[in-house]
Design a protein with these regions (language model features):
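Intrinsically disordered, low-complexity Pro/Gly/Ser/Thr-rich segments with frequent PxxP/GP/PP motifs
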Residues: 92-124, 215-251
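C-terminal motif of bacterial Sec signal peptides marking the signal peptidase cleavage site
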Residues: 13-17
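Bacterial signal peptide processing site
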Residues: 18-22
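Surface-exposed beta-loop interaction hotspot
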Residues: 138-223
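Terminal connector regions
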Residues: 121-162, 248-284
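Short, solvent-exposed loop/turn segments enriched in Ser/Thr/Gly
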Residues: 65-71, 125-132, 185-192, 256-261
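Short, hydrophobic/aromatic beta-strand segments
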Residues: 79-88, 126-130, 200-211, 251-252, ...
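Beta-sheet-dominated interaction scaffolds and their linkers
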Residues: 28-73, 77, 160-190, 288-297
């Protein structure tokens, strides 16, 4: 038991120092990350002899969210090391089983995390029932209940399904160029959020607010409130967001996962929701370059 507890504490210390908060979608999901705190407590076995069981827990860090994945952490409370040859997660909210990746040794009375790629198109709608994990090792297959105390799957499915619905009305993206009022330290830039209607009639998208990131914030403070109204068969809308660096310390420039991922609060046909809009690689590069210049780096 001491080895398992030591491993959990080590993971806690490591992840606390290197991950942030976040949320959903392949290549989607900082302060704006839609994922939740990484380390929900895994159900630890009782003290005493090994229970002879495996325990599974879903977790997601901000980096996981940015990479469009979550992780299943498997605690091995048996007397033998376990090396999975196959891990499969099934969930009624996903259209097909999701295979585990980076399969490797899980020592006795320890735990290991295995990535699970989040599906680009989940089963949107009302789908109920628990997720299950099937683990194959040493010639046998066991089915495990899975804890998800932080609702990683529910949060992802809600956000991704909203994103798909918005894409059918007016996809949102940031322009790749960042305009600046002047070069050098103290400058103010302008981000442009573009809503391009699909032409399908009968829908209205309202953009109420856009949250900042650890690196980039509204020039006037707090969140941007563009209050844009986009008709699904109307013209393209370009919402200008004056921006300044939120911080200028070296550490924030190393936290790349959520630096250019913005939480957008909106209403689609009157239904409120929020989703994360990430800048393209070209746009992210331009935004980070602006922040460095404005910070005087």
């Amino acid at each position: 038991m001491s080895r398992l507890l030591g491993a959990v504490l080590a993971a806690l210390l490591c992840c606390t120092s290197c991950t942030g908060t976040s949320g959903p979608g392949p290549g989607r999901a900082g302060s704006p990350e839609p994922s939740v705190p990484t380390l929900s407590p895994i159900r630890l076995p009782p003290k005493g002899p090994p229970t002879g069981r495996l325990y599974a827990d879903l977790r997601q860090s901000s980096r996981d969210a940015a990479l469009g994945r979550m992780e299943v952490w498997i605690a091995n409370d048996t007397r033998r090391d376990v090396t999975p040859t196959r891990i499969t997660y099934t969930d009624p909210r996903f259209r097909r089983p999701v295979p585990g990746e980076r399969l490797r040794l899980d020592p006795s009375r320890s735990e290991r995390g295995y990535p699970l790629a989040l599906p680009a198109v989940p089963a949107c709608g009302k789908h109920r029932g628990p997720g299950r994990m099937r683990v194959t090792y040493a010639g046998r297959t066991v089915t495990l209940p899975v804890t998800d105390d932080n609702d990683v799957v529910a949060r992802y499915v809600a956000s991704r399904c909203l994103e798909l619905a918005v894409d059918r009305v007016a996809p949102l993206r940031f322009a790749d160029r960042v305009r600046v009022d002047r070069p050098g330290e103290g400058s103010t830039g302008t981000l442009v959020l573009v809503a391009r209607p699909t032409g399908v009639p009968g829908h209205v998208l309202r953009i109420d607010a856009v949250g900042g990131t650890p690196l980039l914030g509204a020039a006037a403070g707090a969140a941007w409130r563009p209050r844009g109204r986009v008709r699904s068969d109307g013209p393209v809308q370009r919402l200008e967001l004056p921006v300044r660096p939120a911080r200028c310390d070296d550490h924030v420039f190393m936290e790349s996962a959520g630096a250019t991922a913005f939480l957008v609060s909106l209403r689609l046909d009157g239904r409120p929701g929020s989703l994360v809009v990430r800048m393209s690689p070209a746009g992210a590069s331009a935004a980070i370059a602006f922040a460095r210049d404005s910070c005087g780096h």
